[in-house]
């Protein structure tokens, strides 16, 4: 799958997945809501309630992973075999088998998420995050061995990708102990966006250069500009996340003014409810006293005795 489609397809998936997660994280930060158990899922009681509770990200991972597996197998015209029939036997298509391993782990991650959210009686967050961490660990190992035969521009492109995957591995490992920390989720989303956009950029650098001329491995300027482009991707994705947060905040404040940050919403509701009840109780007691005052004034002292 070392072609244009093989790089741009996973890149597009990661970009759209990162944008989706950026919206989810922005909403959770704005309303101080839970990232793993958002309140809008429990409050949705309509006919679409079950649809909202479906593991959309899990289904997406399964579908994309399966399609990439089919595409990888179809790219080998002679048939994807593991070893030659000669003596001694030799392994065949090492990079293709590495790609299949990556896509299989992506599909497995989606299946685990679906089972945890929609099959098990009680959701197991540790199982979900563990499957994701396993996939990223294996991805890092495969990428390190994937660039053994690379050099020049291709080596620089994949080295920067390995750097992003390594940082993502550290963040996901930390999330095993702090699954609800907003900062870790924001960094994770940021790294996923960088990983996706850089894969798209890599597809054009390695296979379809915009200039129409291939990049030169012996030209130090080309290698330096690979790093420059990567830094631009970092800045653009940071601005993208900031823009998503700003638009989400503006939308919820202007078009949903009745909504409040979820962290203090229940407290405000209880406080207002108890305060209103206490005020009504005082008014009722005062009205009873006012009604009883004329009756007491009509009773003579003899009657009282």
From Swiss-Prot:
Region feature Disordered, mapped onto this chain: 285-305
Protein's cellular compartments: Membrane
Chief localization: membrane
Residue positions with a glycan: 32
Transmembrane stretches, start-end: 4-24, 54-74, 124-144, 159-179, 187-207, 223-243
Membrane topology (UniProt): Multi-pass membrane protein
Protein family per UniProt: Belongs to the TMEM45 family.
Protein name in UniProt: Transmembrane epididymal protein 1A
Gene: Teddm1a
């Amino acid at each position: 799958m070392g072609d244009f489609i093989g790089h741009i397809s996973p890149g597009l998936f990661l970009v759209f997945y990162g944008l989706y997660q950026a919206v989810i994280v922005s909403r959770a930060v704005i309303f101080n809501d839970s990232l793993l158990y958002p309140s809008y899922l429990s409050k949705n009681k309509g006919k679409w309630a079950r649809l909202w509770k479906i593991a959309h990200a899990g289904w997406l991972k399964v579908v994309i992973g399966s399609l990439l597996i089919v595409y990888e197998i179809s790219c080998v015209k002679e048939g994807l075999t593991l070893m030659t029939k000669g003596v001694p036997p030799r392994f065949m298509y090492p990079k293709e088998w590495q790609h299949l391993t990556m896509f299989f782990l992506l599909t497995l991650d989606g299946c685990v998420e679906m089972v945890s959210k929609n099959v098990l009686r009680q959701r197991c967050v540790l199982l979900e995050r563990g499957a994701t961490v396993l996939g990223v660990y294996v991805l890092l190992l495969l990428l390190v061995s994937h660039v053994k035969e690379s050099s020049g521009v291709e080596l620089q492109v994949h080295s920067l990708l390995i750097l992003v995957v390594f940082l993502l591995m550290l963040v996901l490992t930390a999330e095993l102990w702090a699954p609800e920390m907003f900062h870790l989720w924001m960094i994770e989303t940021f790294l996923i966006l960088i990983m996706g956009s850089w894969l798209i950029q890599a597809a054009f650098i390695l296979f379809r250069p915009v200039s129409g001329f291939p990049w030169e491995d012996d030209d130090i300027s080309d290698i330096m500009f690979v790093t420059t482009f990567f830094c631009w991707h970092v800045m653009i994705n940071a601005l993208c996340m900031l823009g998503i947060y700003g638009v989400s905040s503006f939308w919820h404040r202007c078009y949903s003014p009745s909504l409040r940050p979820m962290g203090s919403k229940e407290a405000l509701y209880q406080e207002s409810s108890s305060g209103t009840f206490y005020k009504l109780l005082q008014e009722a007691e005062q009205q009873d006293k006012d009604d009883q005052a004329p009756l007491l004034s009509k009773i003579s002292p003899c009657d009282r005795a």
